[in-house]
Structures are given as C-alpha cells and as structure tokens.
Amino acid sequence: MGEKKSSSAGKSLAVRKSRHKNCLSEIPPTPDNEAIGIIASLSPPFARRQTIMNNLSHAIDALIAYAREKLGLSSRNAVYARNTVLGLVGAQSYEDSGAVYDGREVSDLLSDLVNACAEAGLPAAEQPERLTDGVMGALMLSPEAVEEAFAAHMRVSSAEATRWLYDYCVHADYVKKKKLDANPRFTAENGLIVTINCAKPEFRDPKKAASGNSVRGGYPACTICRENEGFVGRNKCTLRTVSLELGGEPWFWQFSPYGYFHEHGIAVNQKHIPMHVDRDTFVRLMQFVDLFPHYFIGCNAPLPRIGGSVLAHDHYQGGGEVLPLHRAPIAVPLSHPDFPEIRAGVIDWQGTAVRLSGKNADQIADLSERVRVAWCAYEDAARGLIPVDGDGVHHAVSPTVIKTQNGYEMNLILRSNITSAQYPDGVFHAHPEFHVIKKESIGLIEAQGLFILPGRLVHELADLEALLISGAPLPEQYADYAMLFAEMKAMSPAFTPQSAHEAVKTELASVCSRILKNTAVFEAPSDTAQFLIRKAGFTYGK
C-alpha cells in the first residue's frame, strides 16, 4: 500500500510539473522540495509579469486618486471610472495597489500610465496622446457638470468662475501649462512681449497656415466647433466649454490648450459662420467685458494673411493679461462732434491703431462702425492702399476691448492684406528680411504687442550667441540671419555669455518692433489723424 502511495505522489508531481510549464498562475503551495525547485526556476518570468501588472494597476489607481483630489471624481463614480480606464488601455486584469495622490503633476502621472501600457505590450501605448486624452476625459466631470459648477462660481464673481474653469482645464491636462511655462518669454525695454512657443508648429507657408479657413464638411465642421467637445478623432475628450449669450445669440467660451498669455481663451459663435467685423461685433465685445471685466477680448481681421488661422468660424480671443497696446498712450488726441462723450485718439504705437473710450456702449459701437466703414473704403494708390480689387477685399479692422474705471476702451487696429510684386506675402506684413524670425501672419495678438515666435529659434539663437562669444563668422546655414547678426555684433566689441544673450534679446525686440512698423498702414500717428478727420468726421481734441 505504501509503494502505491509513493507512485501516486510521483504521478501527482509529474502532473504538476506539466501544468507548471503552461500555467504559472496554477502553482499550488507544496512542501515538496522538487516542487519548490520548480517554482524557484519559474519565478523570474512570473515575478516579471506580476510586476508589470502591478505597475499598470498602480498607474491607474494613482490617476483615480488624482481625479478624486483635483477633478471632482466622486467615490460613487470611482469604480466606474477605473473600469472605463481599464477598457481604454485594454487591460485584462487589475489588482488594487492602494495608490494615493502624492502631489505630482498630472503630466507625470500620465507618463507613468503610458510607460506601464508600453511595458505590458498594450496597443494603446502606440497612440499616447489619444490614450491620455481619453483617460483624462473619463476621469473629468461631464460637460453639463462643468457648466453647472461654472454657473455656481459665476454667482460669486466672474473672476472666480474663469479662474476655477482655467484651473480645472489645467488639472485635466487640456491646458498644457507645464509646456507653456517652459516657453522662453521676456518683456523688452520697448514694452513689447516676446515669446517663443515650442509647443506650436510654425506655418511658414501661408497656404498651409490658412488650411483652417475653408470648410471641408465632415464632423465636426472645423477645429473650434462646439461639437469637438468629447470628440476622440481630434483628441478633444478633455475639452470643456461654457455657454455665453452675446448679442442675444448663443456663444460659448473655451480655453486654449496652448495659450499665448494668462488664461488665453476663445469665445466662439455657436453657429458655424465665417469671421466678420461689423457694428454687432463691437456690441458683442463690450457685452463680453461686461460679463468678464477682468479680461480683454478682441477679434482678428476677417481676412487671410492678417487674420487668424480659422476664418471659417466666427470667434474672438481674449484672456487675463493686459497687453502692450492697452498700456500705450495717446499720441494725437481727437474728438467727434456727434459723440461728445467719447474720448478718442490715435495711439502712440508702431502699428496703426485708434482708441475710443467712454461709458456709453451704443455710442462707442456707432463711432467704431464709422471708423471701420471709412477705413474699408479708403484708397491711396500712392501708398498702395487699395480697399478692393480683382483679388477681393483688402482692408479690415481688428477691434480689441478692455474695461477700465472710465468705461469701455475700444482699440481699433487698421489692417491691410494687399500684396505686390515686391511683397508677395503682404505689403503691410513682416518684410522679407525679418522672415527668418517671423513669417507667419501678424494676427490680433501680435498686433497688440505680444509676439509668438517659432520654436526653432531656441536652437538657432543659441548658436548665434555662441558665434558672438567666439567671434567666429556666420556659417552659410545661417545666411538668412546676416543682417540681424551684423546688428548684434555692432552692439559690443566683445561678448561674454551674458552680454551675448542680452544682445540677442535686444535684437529680437527690435525686429518685433520693426515688424509692427511694417504692418502700419499710415507712416505716423499724424497721418492716421488726418485720415480720421477727412474721412470719418473727427476733429483735433485736447
């Protein structure tokens, strides 16, 4: 009987050996020395698989804990959210890791998730942006819940409401604040703000830059339609918008993921209609600052080369930063006999801009419309100012508004997109000698003195600094910088690392100022004043 038991035990062990080769999860506990040896030989791959699963579970749990802390995820919805994330990553198993929020930034937590998915061989890791956008969208409040929370904050103050929404979008990783904070930025002595946007692609080809101007159909119709909210195809699962009413019509507000300034966002018409500027535009802009007096708001000129990249859909840009144009003084005071309550003047500015100030919104809208109509019909062939020709309309106004203790301050920037044989990209655009710094359209934000320069400049300007320090000649690859490099070299007989860096910053600010001057449709403020007096009925003021 004893021998039979021994034989049976041997067969049982043999069966266990066979099973162990194919199913690591079925290893039973046993004191048998041979079985222990088998387990020991199999433990490295088993432990590796267990580690991979633990890493993935930990990454998911850390994000759930983060969402509980920062995104308003309730305990009731936590399990549902976790299962949704498991489905998004394609995981087949999960073990509670007990992870808690440790204070790290969401971008780091998402990197952990992508790395864990890659380690586990999950296909979701091959599209990291889509994966992270989908995961964060699943952890966020719904659009309706965000709208309700925003409305609750609005009952306290509009500043609190926009601050809450902006912070929420940062926490959700829709606004890429970590990347934005890494962008080089400085305020120059001439008052201009210069930034290098490393997160934004450069469109040196105007046709490519204008790709957002035409409607190609499909769904959503363009990149800023409200139907993008939650749309996976454009990685908009984390987009959240809030409703506005402007001019008695439905609009909405959303923050820009790659903003150029503090709390940069856009107000978008609910209807997909082309950009345009008329009296109603001025009214809506002032209504916006009535709602959000801590913001400025403006509208790009609705024409290619001097407007934004999405002219097919009516929208405005604004945010919580006072831009250089808003700080600029009046060079030529003006008044208008039909609007005695409105203070007016030509702004002391490199471009061509007019300021109208007062507390009566209707009067400011009326006078703004007079300026717009006068400018859009103005012709001066000697200066190349042609309002309309066979290529279409060329004159437009870019309005921008802030609210002060004196009421509304409407700044009207006069623009022209006319071209010529000498200036095929635009007579009143950055001239060719400056294209190495900025060739893209000079839109609303730059026209107000905040320049967004391409990311390639980080490395190119660092190379120029090194050349200044060493005294080496400009290599052929940087031939386009010849004029600017000569101007930098003329600033000092010799350069230290610090003085070379300052020389580059000084040159950048000078170039940006000259580009703004290129956009000026009149040579001097006095010329602008004469236009307003002759064509729009203004008189000289005090």
Where are these regions (language model features)?
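Intrinsically disordered, low-complexity segments enriched in serine/proline and basic residues
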Residues: 28-35, 39-43
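Active-site microenvironments that recognize anionic phosphate/pyrophosphate groups
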Residues: 49-267, 271-274, 350, 364-365, ...
